[in-house]
Amino acid sequence: MPGFTVIQFTQDQMRSLTGVSAETVRHWRKTVPYLATKTGKAARFSFAELLGLAVTHELVNCLGVHIGTVSIGVDALFRLLEDSAAPVLEGGIAIITPTAASVRDSGSWSIEPSASPTLAIPLNPLISRLQQHVLPVAPSPSQASLPFPPEAVRSKA
């Protein structure tokens, strides 16, 4: 799409926004093939990749899942997020298995029998947290703006 520039985040920005340490990213690069391409000081991350890192951080830190157990599923998640549009992700739930990943709409998601253990991470809280850091909400003005421009009024005296 001409004229459309994707914002790229540096490694320092990525660590600050996602809360993932440099050592952790280094370890994840060894186990997740998608992250293996993001090496060196020139590595840049898109918003979708930040979201993937935030989901992975939730899996590892909140759910206690070993990254090696779900590395193929996490790799699939990064590739899926890379190809997904932002409106699809909002309100979505990331479904990760040891070998696959998908994003489902939270309104239509239901528990389906699966052949393998499945982890579900809601994306909205993560997207909101990332957006809050990237685009802080400006304070609302104390006076509401007028829906029409002011006009000078003259009296006939």
Residues of each region from the PLM?
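Polyanion-binding surface elements
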Residues: 1-28
